[in-house]
Amino acid sequence: MLNDGVHFVEWSDAGDLIKGDISNNTTKAEILISKSALIWEDKQIVVAGFEFNANEQKVLLWSAPKAIYRRSFEAFYFLYDLNTKKLEALDADHSPQTLAEYSPDGKKVSFIHGNDIFIKDLASGKVSKITEDGKRNKIINGTTDWVYEEE
């Protein structure tokens, strides 16, 4: 359900992200992201999930999720701008990522890579590394260890 409470989004059989209208139960209204727009490095992205930012102008997409523990996963994250119709990697230098999530105002995205926390400013595109001490099975910043997922 979108913020207006009237529209919803879903994947069409053709692989497009489409916006439908609940009031007349139709999904023919508008293609938000066409399947042909989801090409990265000459390969079709198979989207496993997506999330809109607060003003619903950007879509965070993830592909090729790989399980870490019971509930956690790492994936390749992308941002799609609905105004410019531009697709970009969340951060190609630090990929795959875990737990990518919008800030409450939708202007930044935080994510985990290599047990360190990063933040991407969506306006400037600048990625900032927040922690420097992440180490596999030793120091885990921003996420849980396997034992927490078992409890």
Predicted regions and their residues:
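Beta-propeller folds
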Residues: 1-151
